[in-house]
């Protein structure tokens, strides 16, 4: 069952990217990238992880715009993917990009400190 949830998640990720970039006309929704979609084992709930280009205010406005368009997005997913029941969608920010950048910065700093000691 987990394999099917992963396949549905990947298909939803592809379709959501298209829907958000082409179909949503809300000016609050700017440069959004769908980074991951986690679907529950029973295919009832989908958590969509997004990254947004901009400051914190733009991120919050984008989240509000996506929440407002949630019904439309869900109906579009239902038309594009053949499932018995379209999963409930929730949007969350993907913090892994910032976390990865912080780790990269720390590794570069450690590398510089190591070269100074030699």
Curated annotation (Swiss-Prot):
Family from the record: Belongs to the RbfA family.
GO cellular component: cytosol
PANTHER family reported for this sequence: RIBOSOME-BINDING FACTOR A, CHLOROPLASTIC-RELATED (PTHR33515:SF1)
Name of the featured protein: Ribosome-binding factor A
Signal peptide extent: none
Function: One of several proteins that assist in the late maturation steps of the functional core of the 30S ribosomal subunit. Associates with free 30S ribosomal subunits (but not with 30S subunits that are part of 70S ribosomes or polysomes). Required for efficient processing of 16S rRNA. May interact with the 5'-terminal helix region of 16S rRNA.
Keywords: Cytoplasm, Ribosome biogenesis
Subcellular location per the Swiss-Prot or TrEMBL entry: Cytoplasm
Organism in which the protein naturally occurs: Bacillus thuringiensis (strain Al Hakam)
Subunit: Monomer. Binds 30S ribosomal subunits, but not 50S ribosomal subunits or 70S ribosomes.
Cysteine disulfide links: none
């Amino acid at each position: 069952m987990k394999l099917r949830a992963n396949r549905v998640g990947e298909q939803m990720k592809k379709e959501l990217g298209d829907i958000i970039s082409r179909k949503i006309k809300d000016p609050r929704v700017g440069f959004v990238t769908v980074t991951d979609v986690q679907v529950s084992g029973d295919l009832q709930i989908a958590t969509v992880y997004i990254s947004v280009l901009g400051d914190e205010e733009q991120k919050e406005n984008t989240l509000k715009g996506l929440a407002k368009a949630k019904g439309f997005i869900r109906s579009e997913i239902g038309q594009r993917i053949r499932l018995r029941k379209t999963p409930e969608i929730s949007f969350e920010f993907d913090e892994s990009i910032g976390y990865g950048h912080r780790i990269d910065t720390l590794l570069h700093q450690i590398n510089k400190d190591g070269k100074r000691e030699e």
